[in-house]
């Protein structure tokens, strides 16, 4: 029987918000701050919300307008307190106002008559990547790269099994040592979970740690094994709190009277076949997780490769775009996709395009076509969807850009405004440099185009993505120049990632 292993899961607390607070010499745990690009619209997503602001029931991925509305609600209550305490001031408009406001939680707790304020920090993705790299190097002082898996910019899994006897530490002591050094070096607090498998480490961090008191630095560390998991979490709700259990899965489970992991475990004893009928091969994962089991270890997750490979580009437009401007965006996205394929030395067999229409098409009246409901429950025209397959795998811009534009023309209703566009390169494979040719194929022209793409890519990599652009990228409504200055669809914060004043 294999020896029991010990895993850590470490999550940096409200990472983007914490970086912004530290760079402003503010306490990440007591400063009210959201990371959001307010220059877009108030519908923009908050990439992070500081812990003290979350305490007012503002979720971590709220829309900015939702945060604004919630703060207004809180301040309406606080203003009544200020009036009762005769600390409010009456303005020239005859209305009462706060005498003062604060974005510091300690000050707000000490004086209920203060108005709640907060900082809106524009995202600086390059800065976050730099800090994440610094923190990763801290982990590497204690463990080998082979035993650590970064699952995201702010979360890692570590197999510490072999390090506990080496350092003469318990898992809790080693986790605390690493988390403390991260805090000392960066000012950023972390939460850690310890488990006998990766799944339990993740749940210890995500669920159990949230319900235990933090230490003076805001650090929480929780532990789970198979037995304590069943004791602590078999009755936990909602099921969506559990790793890899999304709303769709939960809905199907609840249809069969399964509301907790304990319910699922008990159901699996006699109803395993039924679970496989409902979920197919995914039933195995659900059953394992219900019992607190996870067979995959560090080696397996590091070596995992998806069965199908694709590369995608997607964006939500800042305003509703008419047909012609949306077509320009599709051509720009296809060009970006082409350069990504060229850089990775990949080719694609086909392109899939999805065009999402704006709600204004329904709100204005007159639309009588098919509809769907968006994530906010609003009625919008049904998205357009289509695929074009190439005669042979390719990464040539002349093919990808032109065929993407033709596909847009074929599937998109020119009378509707567009809000979302997603372009996928499907079944990407290594570029073997082989062309499917016939008597009419100009192979010299193909080679010339490929060399030109590689030359342009070299210039972009050396001097920046905006060093070489088509004239169309300077047209009104074009987004390539702006997107080239972003990381993951958000502002990099300038070439040096510096704090904006």
Protein language model features and the residues they cover:
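Compositionally biased, low-hydrophobicity segments enriched in charged and small polar residues
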Residues: 27-30, 34-38, 324-326, 393, ...
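Intrinsically disordered, low-complexity regions
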Residues: 44, 71, 308, 312-314, ...
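Short, charged/polar surface micro-motifs in flexible loops or helix N-caps
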Residues: 13-15, 39-43, 357-362, 428-431
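DNA-contacting surface of Y-family translesion DNA polymerases
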Residues: 2, 9, 241, 247-417, ...
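A glycine-rich phosphate-binding loop feature that marks nucleotide/adenosyl-phosphate handling sites
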Residues: 196-199, 288-291, 347-359, 417-429, ...
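C-terminal hydrophobic structural anchor segments
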Residues: 405-461
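Gly/Gly-Pro- and Ser/Thr-rich, intrinsically disordered tail segments characteristic of DNA damage-repair
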Residues: 1-288, 295-298, 443-501
